[in-house]
Amino acid sequence: LRSVQRLNPALSELQARQLLNEITLILDNNDLGREFYNKLSSNSNIKLIDFQDADRNEWHVTTEFTCENQDSGDSFRPDITCFVNGLPLAFIEVKKPNNHDGILAERERINVRMSNEKFRRFLNVTQLMIFSNNQEYDNENRVPIQGAFYCCTSRDKAFFNVFREADKDFATKYPYKAVSDSVEKQILQHRNCVVIKNLPDYNTNKDTNTPTNRILTSMLSKERFLFLLRYGFAYVDRKIELEDGSKTTQLEKHVMRYQQLFASLTIRKKLDNGIKSGIIWHTQGSGKTALAYYSVRSLTDFYAAKNTAVKFYFIVDRLDLMEQAKDEFVARGLSVRTANSRDELMSDIRSTNLTENAEGKAEIMVVNIQKFKQDSAKIQIDSNYSIRLQRIFFIDEAHRGYNPHGSFLANLLAADKDAIKIALTGTPLLKEERESWRVFGDYIDTYYYDKSIADGYTLKLMREPVETIYKEKIENILDKLAGGIEVRRSDIDRNKIIEHESYLNALIDYIIADFRR
């Protein structure tokens, strides 16, 4: 109550209490906390958190904070709970290194809690959950057995994400507040564990460079945590197909992956330094469309602080990619416009209208340039607007449609010299493609296959030799297709071979047999 009144001095005590009562009610919603999060992170006149000045917020930590449903008596007590302005927005579960079942036991425990409706209110208010047994990650094991992981709430199953700090010295160089011996003793007395102060493990665990302390500093230091609270979560209305063939929508809550967090922070840093273009190389399947969504929210506020309005464009070169991107943005709550022609796009670019939807949602235009990407006609953009306007282009796999020597995209970006150009890719670039991409500048952020495999997002492909019996069978089929004629392998049309029914049947038989083993 005190924090609400301090951040909102225009509210009377009665109005502040009514606001807190409203929050209590919406936390009981069966919406994974969406309504509460929208209220927490919004730019409305009513503030629950001051996102601009970290020191205007009240920060507290407690141990074994009891979360109890008074009606049922069900309860649990996280090891550590973090409060911002009295709201329990994060908790940490910590275990000893080399503990039985590693971190798996914690994952199973939180999955049980997530499926228990009696805990819905507390899980709806909790934004970030961290689990650690203070060991380094086992990169050879896709199952999270050891390490420090984070997740957000879910209907029934938590997805444990790894966190790898981009700045290796972030934790060791962080300006921690010194804790006096008397305060340390007071904390240990409060926990009734003064005796552990003389144990070797105690001093080891206090080291800032342990896995647990690194993730806590990376994610819960004030500025980082406020950034995550403001921009790092997304509610996704995912379309799914049920067993009976019917389709429905399932609500999911997502938290930024660490590479999306660092790319978002680096984009802002580059813009602050006057750099208006760059390349983000994140491997396929790592969430580049989601990164664009997070960036819409982050960069809207970034330019609002400069009294500048923003229009966002996401450019693809195929119709199916346009539909896919549109669906991803809509599922996350953006209002999406589309353009399939040059005229549609140029009309929108020349317009000073910032929003077209009645709900006031953030907007993005998804553009398919497939039909007109080779259009080399010059483009004229009038920049004499009565409002300060910044256009931001996300170019998805731009190397496929970008020709610096004369194409629609090249002419468009050249005509809008003040535009922000963020090129996205996740595929290896050929030499000639790298040359054309130099116009976008240096890399903003990279996230390669090796990290994606280690993080469990990408499966490692294992090359295995084909068994002799099947190799001989396929060789016989090739001989039959040649009709008994002696020919060189280089003279055979490979496509006709691999599309032939006899070849396909033999190959499918081998694959099925291999999987059954």
Which residues fall in each region the model found?
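ATP-dependent helicase/translocase motor core
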Residues: 1-311, 316, 320, 324-335, ...
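Conserved helicase ATPase motor motifs in RecA-like P-loop NTPase domains
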Residues: 283-284, 399-401, 415-432
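Interdomain helical connector at the RecA1-RecA2 junction of SF1/SF2 helicase-like NTPases
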Residues: 434-517
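Conserved motor-coupling elements within RecA-like helicase/translocase cores
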Residues: 344-365
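Structural recognition of the conserved hydrophobic beta-strand(s) that form the central parallel beta-sheet
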Residues: 131, 365-368, 394, 420-425
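Short basic/glycine-enriched coil/helix segment immediately N-terminal to the Walker B
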Residues: 84, 272-276, 305, 358-361, ...
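SF2 helicase catalytic motif II
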Residues: 384-420
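Residues immediately C-terminal
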Residues: 321, 371-374, 399-403, 429-430
